[in-house]
């Protein structure tokens, strides 16, 4: 079997619509377009969002906010999430492999939410004051 020989199963597809081939076909003369009007003409379709000259909805509503380019590059991590990692030396690569942060993230900050009971060594990861105190209390280290 090759990609260029694959075909749909028999009866799975409909025959193409043959328009303008006589009265008996059911789609003769006007070809299913009705009589007159913009939609009956060739090339007679307006652009998406066009409301016949009325000010379109997307222009009536005010512009609002913007899409931050940095939001996908930054991530927060709880102390309790560090507990679930089996490795003791933790850096950004380890967090990505554990699935705790997205692959697009380049900056991580550990926040003091939850509890930690095992000593971990953080490398290249920022921490808040509360998180730093909690990590160092259980014998952990933080390197930048």
Curated annotation (Swiss-Prot):
Region annotated Disordered, chain positions: 20-49
Native source organism of the sequence: Neisseria gonorrhoeae (strain ATCC 700825 / FA 1090)
Gene Ontology cellular-component annotations: cytosolic large ribosomal subunit
Stretches assigned to coiled coil: none
Family annotation (InterPro entries): Ribosomal_uL15, Ribosomal_uL15/eL18, Ribosomal_uL15/eL18_sf, Ribosomal_uL15_bac-type, Ribosomal_uL15_CS
UniProt biased composition (Gly residues): 21-31
Gene3D superfamilies: 3.100.10.10
Oligomer status and interactors: Part of the 50S ribosomal subunit.
GO-annotated molecular function: rRNA binding; structural constituent of ribosome
SUPFAM superfamilies documented for this protein: Ribosomal proteins L15p and L18e
Name recorded for this polypeptide: Large ribosomal subunit protein uL15
Keywords annotated in UniProt: Ribonucleoprotein, Ribosomal protein, RNA-binding, rRNA-binding
Function: Binds to the 23S rRNA.
NCBIfam families in alphabetical order: rplO_bact
Family (UniProt): Belongs to the universal ribosomal protein uL15 family.
One example of a Gene Ontology biological process annotation: translation
Domain of life where this protein originates: Bacteria
Pfam families: Ribosomal_L27A
